[in-house]
Structures are given as structure tokens and as C-alpha cells.
Amino acid sequence: IAGNGQFPFLVLEAAKRLGHELTVVGIQEEADSALERVSTKHHLNSFHWVSLGQLGKCIEILTTAGVSRALMAGQVRHTKLFAGVVPDRVMLATLARALTKNTDALISAVADTFGEHGIELVDSTSFLGPLLAKEGLLTSRELSEAQRTDLQFGYEMADAVARLDIGQTIAVKDQAVVAIEAMEGTDAVIARAGQL
């Protein structure tokens, strides 16, 4: 199930390389139209477009294709939930189930709905092991003491923000929080922090 950005392309390439049969559902106004062309190039079982509110249609497409495991790849702008989404009955029931409208609650409710229809929602990084950062220092230069202090401070702040389910990204400098992710997404908070 594809949102925006390069992540869906990476997942598609990796899953195909591993020999998986794929049915791709692109979210209209989110997923890149090039994803349909790439899917055709890989001779996938099928490619379908749904609007953000068509969870029932998405489930119908997947169950008809015999899908028992699905993953979501790519961002879906949360602001879209508050403007112009026309939810189908399945989406309405799913939104009603979510106690809040933050990311964790929404994804959990969607996962539960998929599960009720025999579709397990799997980790979006399942096929991307070689592309994920390994634990530890990623540069050839050791961190300074000030950078280590910022890193520890940043970890504690990010952990606190994540517990509140506000976002997953923060930027810090000299033990001050410069920017916190909210609904605008990771890329936007990084760009904003760079401007500050």
C-alpha cells in the first residue's frame, strides 16, 4: 500500500528481487504515478489506485488478489485526514475505533481492520535490511564530547516526544530542542531545523 516518496519504490524493488508476488495499491494524490509504470515493468499481479478514504476498496482489492500479508510504504500526509477525505463505511468504522487521530492510533486501527479481513500488516522495512543504518557510529570521525552530550539529550527528548505520539523526529543543538516533528512530517521538520 503505497504513499508518497521513494520508500514505496525501494520496497517494490526489494520485494520483487526476493521473488514475492505483489499487488500494489497506490493512494491517489499521495503515491507517485511513476509507481504504476514501475509496477507494470516488473509484471506485477496488479496495480490499483484508491483514495485515502477507501479502506474498504483497498481491502477488497487485496482479498480478491489472495493477499494475506500487506505493508504500508511511504508517507501519507496526516493533514489530508482533515480536509476533503470521503471515508467509506469501513474507513468510518476504523476511524471511530481509533481513540485519537494520531499516527500510532490510526495505524493500529487500520492494522486491526486488515486483521479482521485476514490480512496481516507487516513491518514496512521487512525487505530493506541492507538499506537500514547499522547500530553505532556512521562516520569515520569520532564524536566530540559536545556532540555526545547533544546525542544523549536528543535521544531523551525524542523518546519523550514519541511517547506523546506527537512525531518521531527532533533536531537539537547545544542541548536545546530546535525543531519537533508534528503533522508536517520528517522531511519538513529537517528542512525547518536547517533554516533555524
Predicted regions, residues:
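Short glycine-rich anion-binding loops that position phosphate/pyrophosphate groups of nucleotides
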Residues: N4, Q75-H78, A176
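Short beta-strand segments
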Residues: I1, V25-G26, A70-G74, V172-K173
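N-terminal beta-loop-helix "entrance" segment that forms/cooperates
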Residues: G26-S51
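Conserved mixed alpha/beta catalytic, RNA-binding, or beta-rich assembly cores of soluble enzyme
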Residues: A15, E120, S124-L196
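Short coil/turn connectors at secondary-structure junctions
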Residues: L18-E21, L44, A65-S68, E116-I119, ...
